[in-house]
């Protein structure tokens, strides 16, 4: 009898996590990921992208990387924003699927098999849609802006389920390989590559510690995702250093 965590057709997975002041949660996140991933993947990696944290996040990431061959660290020189950090991690991913998950433990790693099972139904992108939103006001407004922007591209049914807990086929990144702008929305970029979007309901958890990092300034920046200022997001991946 199969374990409840198993899904058909074990595959290779790159987990990408943008980290901003996440020193209190990333050790626990990696521990839980390391329990789930071996049961559902033949190969996996955990890419932690330090997005200009002001705490000891990079020191913790460095320590995790030095003790585990599956953990990789990318260190950005300053805070570029969640989606820019995600884009750097996505471009560094080496396995067939990319799964994005926040650093605050609101997205339970134990729910990953549900996303993969839904992907096996023929989708290219699958979101973990929360039964109940756990976000603060600014984060909720940012999510609302994203959903409004995506509605025309993917339809209202898909747009309402968009979240930062997502899995997609790594080959989709080829559609935005040359994208260069400081204003990045991973969800918009994914619409350049496919129309096969799906979702599955998962239970989000309260934040492990601290409060949301979304500020009014970040909210305004998030609302400008369609800007085309010719500054390379890809360059941000080079402005720092990485492990493995």
Segments predicted by a language model, with ranges:
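Acceptor/aglycone-binding surface of glycosyltransferases and processive sugar-polymer synthases
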Residues: 72-78, 82-92, 97, 106-188, ...
């Amino acid at each position: 009898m199969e374990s409840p965590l198993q899904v058909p057709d074990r595959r290779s997975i790159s987990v990408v996590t943008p980290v901003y002041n996440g020193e209190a949660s990333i050790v626990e996140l990696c521990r839980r990921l390391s329990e789930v991933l071996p049961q559902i993947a033949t190969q996996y990696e955990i890419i932690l992208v330090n997005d200009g944290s002001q705490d000891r996040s990079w020191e913790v990431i460095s320590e995790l990387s030095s003790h585990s061959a599956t953990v990789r660290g990318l260190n950005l020189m300053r805070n570029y924003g969640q989606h820019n950090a995600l884009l750097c991690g996505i471009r560094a991913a080496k396995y067939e699927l990319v799964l994005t998950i926040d650093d605050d433990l609101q997205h339970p790693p134990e729910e990953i098999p549900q996303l993969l099972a839904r992907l096996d139904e023929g989708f290219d992108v699958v979101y973990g849609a929360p039964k109940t939103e756990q976000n603060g006001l600014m984060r909720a407004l940012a999510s609302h802006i994203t959903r409004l922007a995506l509605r025309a591209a993917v339809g209202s049914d898909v747009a309402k389920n968009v979240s930062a807990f997502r899995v997609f086929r790594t080959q989709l990144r080829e559609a935005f390989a040359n994208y260069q702008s400081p204003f990045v929305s991973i969800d918009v970029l994914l619409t350049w590559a496919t129309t096969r979007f799906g979702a599955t309901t998962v239970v989000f958890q309260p934040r492990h510690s601290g409060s949301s990092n979304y500020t009014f300034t970040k909210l305004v920046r998030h609302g400008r995702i369609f800007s085309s200022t010719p500054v390379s997001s890809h360059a941000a991946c080079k402005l720092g250093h990485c492990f493995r």
